[in-house]
């Protein structure tokens, strides 16, 4: 039987643990993402995402097809809209990390959405060709400061701790696992101490013996993470943004040198 795909057709959609809107949100899909359909139940589809994460998504939030969506451009602004080509009627909102099939035109881009509808946007679209540096990763990470915490979130509408880290690295075409414990396990051969961490390395924290939180290292003991909202805090007890709870829960850090090369 030919493989079927669920092409996400809204800027951000929740993916649930069960085929029920009342069940837990486990993660999110972003506009343009093509998910592999592995099962269905009524109006719901069980899908696998690019990072191996699976869950249930409602039929109204995407297109079921035997082809992946031909996206060639990424949204690099925090928000935007797609309007009908013939007017100002908004047909889709946009957020950072959405991917679209589009081409440049004067003052913006013409786009074809996953359902085939055509529109126009002035939102900044492009391809990430910049080779990531530790500085560029931190610059991007800081641009999300203030975004609220959202369990399962992986967009500027709301991030959870690991969704924040995954989004930052995926922007530079570097794919990380979805959850904090998976990220920790992925880099288990690259563990370092808190003091050895450079900016853009990862700090991991445990609760009850299990890894439950991740943060992005900066210099001099500072770090960025999503807890309540995306913020900068410190391991230094003399700093005004010292987080004593996380320092007590600190497990270890990992170097990102294996994927950054620096």
Feature roles, as predicted:
Residues 64, 127, 190-191, 218-262:
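Aromatic- and glycine-rich peptidoglycan recognition patches
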């Amino acid at each position: 039987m030919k493989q079927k795909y669920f092409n996400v057709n809204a800027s951000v959609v929740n993916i649930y643990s069960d085929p029920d809107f009342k069940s837990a949100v486990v993660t999110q899909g972003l506009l343009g993402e093509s998910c592999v359909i592995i099962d269905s139940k009524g109006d719901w589809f069980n899908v696998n995402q690019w990072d191996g994460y699976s869950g249930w998504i409602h039929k109204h939030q995407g297109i079921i097809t035997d082809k992946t969506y031909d996206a060639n451009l990424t949204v690099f602004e925090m928000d935007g809209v797609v309007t009908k080509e013939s007017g100002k009627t908004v047909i889709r909102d946009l957020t950072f990390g959405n991917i679209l099939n589009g081409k440049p035109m004067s003052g913006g881009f013409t786009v074809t959405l996953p359902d085939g509808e055509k529109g126009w946007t002035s939102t900044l679209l492009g391809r990430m060709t910049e080779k990531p540096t530790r500085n560029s990763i931190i610059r991007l990470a800081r641009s999300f400061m203030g975004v609220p915490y959202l369990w399962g979130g992986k967009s500027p509408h709301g991030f959870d701790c690991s969704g924040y880290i995954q989004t930052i690295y995926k922007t530079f075409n570097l794919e990380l696992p979805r959850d904090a414990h998976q990220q920790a396990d992925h880099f288990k051969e690259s563990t370092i101490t808190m003091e050895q961490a450079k900016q853009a390395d990862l700090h991991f924290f445990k609760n009850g013996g299990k890894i439950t939180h991740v943060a992005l290292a900066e210099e001099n003991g500072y770090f960025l993470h999503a807890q309540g909202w995306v913020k900068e805090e410190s391991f230094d007890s003399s700093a005004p943004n010292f987080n004593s709870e996380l320092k007590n829960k600190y497990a270890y850090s990992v170097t990102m040198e294996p994927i950054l090369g620096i």
